[in-house]
From Swiss-Prot:
InterPro entries: WD40/YVTN_repeat-like_dom_sf, WD40_repeat_CS, WD40_repeat_dom_sf, WD40_rpt, WDR24, WDR59_RTC1-like_RING_Znf, Znf_RING, Znf_RING/FYVE/PHD. A zinc finger (RING-type) spans 1057-1100. It is found in: Vacuole. It holds the Pfam family WD40. Residues 509-521, 548-569, 577-590 have a biased composition (Polar residues). This is Restriction of telomere capping protein 1. Belongs to the WD repeat RTC1 family. It comes from Scheffersomyces stipitis (strain ATCC 58785 / CBS 6054 / NBRC 10063 / NRRL Y-11545) (Yeast). Residues 694-711 have a biased composition (Basic and acidic residues). Keywords: Metal-binding, Repeat, Vacuole, WD repeat, Zinc, Zinc-finger. May be involved in a process influencing telomere capping. The keyword Disulfide bond does not apply. GO terms for biological process: positive regulation of macroautophagy; positive regulation of TORC1 signaling. Residues 481-523, 535-590, 692-711, 734-754 are annotated as: Disordered.
């Protein structure tokens, strides 16, 4: 018997392979029916090989591209199923490109007992029928099943309706073809439960129309056609509302590409326009779904928002914003309410339906139902949210193949469990039971809430503050709806933070309406201390009324002991959106009176026995994170090389800035980098630097250059550009090395550099007075002689190339006149002061010279006109930039040198020449610029010094790309700009972006720029300013004066500019003050910046400082 069964199973498998091919892509056996063949063969061999399931997950691989699915709740009696599988009531309908299949499931929906090809009318329920040929244009875009009816919306605007028999046979009964474009949504009208037979159907299309069809009639024309307006606004989704309170009222909701939510009443005689229209989303709204019990609809859009809105008649009058809003991490493609309430709501304490009661609204129906959403982009997740905790998903489903989700629905099932059916873009149907606890499901269903800790610590970037948040996991926003007619609005509020823990047994009710206002869209009031001006009554009052009874600030004023507690005596209130002309999310109010509270009939409060959640801010006085120091460094650090400056000069200037705020370590880093740059790099045309290989090659050949090449270095070298005093008569009339006097262009550049240096020194003279202890009189002569005294007396290693005359001096060097000495003193004055100020040890007393007579030997050993004058290293590079000597002194030097034979030491060879070794590679110096820069960046990154990292990246990135990776540079600059913006140093942030390297700038702009959504509301009726009526009416009139200084809804003009009393016609050029007055950007800039006023121009005593 066993061999016959195996033979029969093998034959059926081969037969199924001939029809469908190999469709089982190595799917595990516990994943249910992985192909059409596996479901059929398993049902036939059930008695011999029982189905092996380890959890309730069903997988089916579709052989064609699929886009939509629905559920058919109709009992089927299939002849090829066993007795236990008779009268099956829950089935899956999957549609796609030339594809429409009915998957019959068993009673617990754990496996597929049969699949039926609906498009092939000759196929009843057997498997030996082939799929429809490709020449049939049945590209199904949406499917909706009800009772025994299956409606299909095609991409060509055609609607087909199939009738399903009890034996599984499907036949085509209707074809409707009045739409011009793709069908996006289908629904049935007049349906109250899952098993009612439909008689009417609505369809929403890309052509912007909704059509009503009578399925009892044989006419292919619609009964009614409605649209949202005169122009075509594509309809993404539409649905019939079964919760209409009016008698025989047929309400249909739709969402459009404009982001609008429209409400239609099909009983109206005209039937052409919506009864109500709300602009909820700022981009295309892509999906909607009506709540199973109440008149609430959830919508999702491309603006990454999920909105819950009450569309009931009692809530229509002044509703302009959603009741609830969930911000998601991606554009929302589909959103669905769960069909069953979540039984786990009891985990929030007691069951919600025992205390969430109200006269007009049962909140348990809103907060006990979950909602799920999928995303538009290639995202492989379905996120499940609950309004009790809307800031974090309750569960997240991730497909095992990591393929994007195409569509999903909540499935009806006998056990009333939360079950989701999905199809992916890889054409795989899957079933997920969220209430089934199994270890294998945990890899695909994650619960982010379980992964969070009760206590969270985070740093505030840029300010050095620390925040600790404590929050119980199941006590977040447990809402209770009470009557607004309560005598005590504030309830029993404990005013002391410690007393809330002492009386932990007694519950304290905190009324949220007193904390944030009685409306979620209401802006908070502004309170100021009373003024005593005599002309107070003659001044313009603030448009914002003062309502002390409904604000947290008023309550704080009535209880002065709360001011010492810094707001810790109360639980953290919810963040609200301010209904103003500026934006919903801004705390700045625009316009006048806020929305009235007369339409609000309930208030929300949460009941806790102690403070949960609570936030503990900690301020740490970190010496290395001083805000003033940060601002000084960001303002004064040079992040680019000015004209006439070199990179060495910029490093020295930045060193002086760091020393001025007592950042001596950073000062030394800048100075060491300056010294290493002068040693390793050769400057070409004041801007171009050679790479390391070229520099090393040039260094070995520098000794072979003749003296004429040294003389070719003009007076307008590094220090010549740095100091602009070489246009004097003593230098302009002397031609050294064949160079004439400075041209007009060079003179101008030198003067500009000198002016810039003087300006920098003057701006820092006050901050560096305590570091300077050198006498002003004759300071340059004194410093120069003292330094050469120290240099001649220290035990340094002497280069053998240098003559004794160069080291110790000779009496024959008397050819230098007094004019040359004065010239040196004059030109080196500014640089000496800048470098000495940059040294942390500059405050130490310099040894006095032994005599006041000129020391010619020390003078000739000086490296002339180099910015390494104060550097601790004097090497051959300084000699190469030696100042031209007089002819007499030079002849004496040549005679002295010619009588000597030079011998190089081994140390000189190791430093200056390539020593022959086994590898043949030159010895690398540890103080090369690249090595020092790499170590400086590593140190700054480990210390968290974002200013030093960013400044070094801006200055050295182009020359040292091998040291500074592009990713690191982008991360440092992005974080630096973010901190600058948080500190309101916007000008500095813009300078960082503009001076960023070319290959980093584009990525940096994309990283730092973000979309800002601004929504403007009328200051009188508090409705969104869209003015669609005027826009439609005046779109053909070229001379029409269309704008947003008036409101179409209330037909009133908005407030004029408080400065010029002219209408504010623009949307983005309007600036509003916290007092409620507003005006043009140019007018307020003239008032506050140019005229330097501090108070509001309306005279309401509001001060911006």
């Amino acid at each position: 018997m066993s061999s016959n069964a195996n033979s029969q199973h093998s034959t059926l498998a081969k037969f199924a392979f001939n029809i469908y091919g190999s469709l089982n892509h190595a799917t595990p056996s516990y994943e249910g029916s992985a192909s059409p063949s596996s479901s059929y063969s398993s049902s036939r061999s059930k008695t011999n090989e029982p189905y092996n399931y380890r959890f309730n997950k069903l997988v089916y691989n579709c052989e064609r591209e699929v886009t939509t699915l629905s559920q058919l709740n109709y009992p089927l009696s299939l002849s090829n199923t066993f007795q236990s599988d008779q009268n099956l009531s829950h089935h899956v309908i999957i549609g796609g490109r030339n594809y429409l299949k009915l998957l019959a499931l068993n009673e617990d929906q754990s496996r597929i007992v049969q699949d039926i090809n609906v498009l092939d009318q000759s196929s009843i329920y057997t498997h030996n029928s082939r799929v429809p040929s490709t020449n049939k244009l049945n590209n199904i875009n949406t499917v909706k099943a009800q009772s025994d009816t299956i409606g299909c919306g095609l991409s060509n605007g055609l609607i087909t309706v199939y009738k399903v028999g009890s034996n599984g046979k499907c036949r085509l009964i209707h074809k409707f073809s009045d739409h011009k474009r793709c069908i996006n949504s289908l629904d049935y009208v007049g349906i109250r439960n899952l098993y009612d037979a439909p008689t009417q159907m609505i369809s929403g299309s890309q052509d912007g129309s909704i059509k009503l069809w009578d399925m009892r009639s044989s006419s292919p024309r619609p009964m009614l056609t409605i649209s949202s307006g005169s122009h075509s606004d594509p309809i993404r989704s539409c649905q019939y509302s079964p919760h209409s309170q009016g008698r025989n009222k047929l309400v249909v909701l739709s969402v459009h590409d404009s982001g609008a939510l429209c409400k239609f009443d099909l009983r109206l005689s005209n039937g052409h326009g919506p009864e109500r229209k709300w602009n909820i989303h700022t981009g295309p709204a892509l999906s909607l779904h009506i709540h199973p019990e109440k008149e609430y609809v959830v919508t999702g859009g491309r603006d990454q928002k999920i909105c819950v809105f009450n569309y009931g008649d009692s809530q229509i009058s002044n509703r302009i914003t959603p009741d609830e809003m969930i911000n998601t991490y991606g554009p929302v493609m589909k959103v669905r309410w769960c069909l069953y309430p979540d039984a786990s709501t009891s985990q929030f304490g007691e069951p919600l339906d025992t205390f969430q009661q109200s006269n007009d609204f049962n909140s348990s129906s809103l907060y006990s139902y979950d909602l799920a959403c999928s995303y538009l982009n290639d995202d492989s997740t379905v996120a499940i949210y609950n309004l009790n905790r809307k800031f974090i998903p309750k569960e997240v489903i991730t497909t095992s193949s990591n393929k994007p989700i195409q569509n999903f629905i909540w499935a009806n099932n006998p056990g009333s469990s939360r079950k989701i059916w999905t199809i992916t873009k890889s054409n795989v149907f899957s079933s997920y039971d969220l209430d089934m606890h199994d270890s294998l499901l945990e890899s695909e269903i994650s619960k982010p809430l379980d992964e969070l800790a009760n206590v969270t610590v985070d740093w505030n970037n840029g300010f050095g503050d620390l925040c600790l948040a404590n929050q119980e996991k199941y006590e977040f926003e447990i809402t209770e709806v009470e009557s607004q007619a309560s005598d005590n609005d504030m309830g029993d509020i404990d005013t002391e933070y410690s007393s809330r823990y002492e009386r932990s047994n007694s519950n304290s009710v905190i009324d949220e309406s007193s904390l944030i206002g009685s409306s979620s869209a209401e802006k908070p009031p502004l309170f100021r201390s009373s003024t005593h001006y005599s002309m107070h009554m003659a001044k313009s009052p603030s448009p914002v009324p003062r309502r002390g009874s409904t604000s947290f600030a008023a309550h704080s004023e009535s209880q002065p002991n709360l001011s010492n507690m810094q707001g810790l005596s109360m639980s953290r209130p919810k963040l609200t959106r301010n209904l103003s002309q500026a934006t919903e999310d801004s705390s700045i109010s625009i316009g006048s009176a806020p929305q009235s509270n007369i339409h609000l009939k309930s208030k929300r409060s949460f009941q806790v026995s102690y403070a949960s959640p609570y936030l503990v801010p900690v301020s740490l006085p970190l010496s290395l994170n001083d805000e003033n120091v940060f601002e000084i460094l960001s303002n004064n650090y040079l992040i680019s090389i000015p004209d006439g400056f070199t990179l060495v000069d910029v490093c020295l200037l930045n060193a002086s800035v760091a020393a001025s705020v007592q950042r001596f370590r950073e000062c030394q880093i800048w100075r060491v980098l300056a010294v290493s740059l002068e040693e390793d790099y050769v400057q070409i045309d004041n801007t171009t630097f050679l790479s390391d290989p070229e520099l090393e090659h040039n260094e070995t050949n520098q000794d072979e250059k003749i003296d004429d090449q040294k003389d070719a270095k003009s007076i307008s070298s590094d220090l010549g550009n740095f100091v602009g005093s070489y246009n004097s008569n003593s230098t302009s009339t002397t031609n050294y090395g064949g160079l004439g006097s400075l041209s007009a262009k060079d003179t101008t550049k030198a003067n500009n550099s000198n002016n810039l240096m003087d300006m920098i020194n003057r701006s820092r003279v006050n901050s560096m007075n305590h570091l300077q202890s050198i006498s002003p009189s004759g300071s340059h002569t004194f410093i120069r002689n003292a330094i050469h005294e120290n240099k001649s007396n220290e035990n340094a290693i002497v280069d053998d190339d240098e003559t004794d005359a160069a080291v110790h001096g000779t009496e024959g060097r008397i050819g230098t006149s007094h004019v040359s000495e004065d010239l040196d003193n004059e030109n080196l004055n500014i640089l000496n002061n800048a470098v000495l100020n940059s040294s942390p040890n500059s405050a130490m007393t310099t040894p006095h010279p032994q005599s006041n007579s000129p020391n010619y030997s020390n003078f000739f050993s000086l490296p002339k006109l180099s910015s390494t004058f104060m550097s601790p290293i004097y090497d051959e590079f300084a000699e190469k930039q030696e100042q031209p000597r007089s002819l007499k002194a030079e002849s004496l030097l040549n005679n002295d040198v010619s009588d000597r034979t030079t011998t190089k030491s081994e140390l000189t060879k190791a430093i200056k020449e390539e020593v022959d070794n086994s590898s043949g590679a030159p010895l690398k110096k540890a103080w090369k610029s690249s090595s020092l820069l790499e170590k400086a960046l590593a140190h700054a990154s480990n210390e968290g010094d974002i200013i030093l990292c960013s400044t070094l990246s801006l200055l050295f990135y182009d020359s040292f790309k091998q040291v500074i990776p592009q990713s690191s540079c982008l991360d440092w600059l992005g974080l630096y700009i973010e901190i600058l913006q948080r500190k309101r140093l916007f000008v500095n942030a813009i300078h960082v972006v503009n001076n960023a390297p070319d290959d980093v700038r584009s990525k940096l702009k994309n990283l730092t720029s973000g979309d800002v959504d601004l929504r403007f509301f009328c200051c009188w009726c508090q409705k969104l300013l869209v003015n669609e009526k005027s826009k439609e009416k005046l779109k053909n009139d070229v001379n029409a004066d269309f704008g947003y200084w008036y409101c179409d809804e209330c037909s009133q003009k908005q407030s004029n500019c408080i400065y010029c009393n002219e209408p504010c016609k623009g949307l983005t050029v309007v600036v509003s003050l916290k007092c409620g007055h507003r005006g043009h950007f140019g007018c307020l800039r003239e008032w506050f910046i140019e005229d330097e006023n501090n108070e509001c121009p309306g005279g309401c005593d509001y001060s911006v400082v």
